[in-house]
Amino acid sequence: MGYHGGTMRVLGRRIYWRWYGEVLLEGGVTLRMTGDVAKWLRPGDRVRLRTEFKKPVLGFDEYALEAAFPLWPPFAKTLEHVRESPFGGEAYRYRLKVREATYEGDYEAIAELEQFHYASEKEVVALWVCTQCQKTIPANAKPLCDCGGEARLKEIRGSTPASRFLVLELAERLPFEPRILGYLRLDPPIPRMHRRTPEGVERDIRERIFPRDWFHPTYEGGADWQKALDRVNTAAARIARVVVHPDYRSEGFGALLVRVALEWAKERGAPEARRE
């Protein structure tokens, strides 16, 4: 990629969805990226931009961005995974891509996998919002709003505004095989709900640090969440969840996702990409 832009200052950000946001740089440049990346860039941050294009708005595939860590394009790793035969040798070879969730369809696939994780029709795994009337609709699958408007995925059950996701994608698949085989959720190292100290047991630690609506119920938004994200600067990351499609749970994909997540956290400083 050719060099144009150099070191620039972040002026602002707009977060629309987990899969779509914009970052405004000095000089009138707007970068389109996922909301899960854009929300970590604070006004005043210095970033390094590389692009071949001289235009005010740069799309997903038109630039690279770095700060303390590479920020864009999203993390991705292509690999092969061999299933061995019980009699020795290779039984099957998967060609896979492990990457950060980037597109709306990725998050819809995550919501679908959550249904396998909870395995109960009584458990609602996602929140959707109508783009016409702005009504929030709890549902396991994409619902139809009463007003006739299109519902789009807003949030995944149990996740927080700080959560970031890796998806395990079949790079080569047969028509009957799912595109996304599993996912991993990476969070800041939020303390456990209760902890034991010399003085006794401290309860509900997370709610003392983060807004209550991050956990009860699944996050729906609030005035304080971006301020909380702006203060995050961790020395570690926490693997909060690993879910694999039930038809593929004997293939070692869960362990594979964990190994790649460790690379992601090391190479990109995920989730917030600020620690030194």
Give the residues covered by each predicted segment.
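Conserved acyl-donor/pantetheine-binding loop and adjacent beta-alpha core of acyl/acetyltransferases
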Residues: 125-127, 156-159, 163-165, 173-245
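Cysteine-rich micro-motifs
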Residues: 140-150
